[in-house]
């Protein structure tokens, strides 16, 4: 049975919809290739996904003694985090709701067999 190496980023300040665009680019790829791809992807979410993926690779090397060349992305998800809600008061007694969306990013790596 293969060992799962995990890393998570909670309450990332980018919406899950925007993070999923980046996550779909790297799903199933080798970890080293995915890190290179994320480094040159012009999206704000790519920075956060790169950070989590680099952390997962470091966990694999430090805690499990696995070479980074043998790792691939087994599972990567971007889920919704709690939304911060507040309002801006408008004319005639109305208000306009503001939603600040966040996301949780989870990366699971496995070793190639």
Language-model features: where?
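Ribosome large-subunit tunnel/peptidyl-transferase-proximal elements
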Residues: 1-78, 103-113
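Strongly charged
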Residues: 81-113
């Amino acid at each position: 049975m293969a060992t799962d190496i995990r890393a998570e980023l909670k309450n990332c300040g980018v919406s899950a919809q925007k993070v999923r665009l980046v996550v779909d680019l790297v799903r199933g790829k080798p970890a080293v290739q995915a890190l290179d791809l994320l480094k040159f992807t012009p999206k704000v979410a790519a920075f956060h996904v790169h950070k989590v993926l680099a952390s997962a690779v470091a966990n694999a090397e430090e805690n499990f003694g696995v070479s980074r060349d043998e790792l691939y992305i087994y599972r990567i998800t971007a889920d919704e985090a709690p939304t911060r809600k507040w309002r801006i008061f408008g004319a005639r007694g109305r208000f306009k709701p503001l939603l600040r969306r966040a996301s949780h990013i989870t990366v699971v790596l496995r070793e190639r067999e």
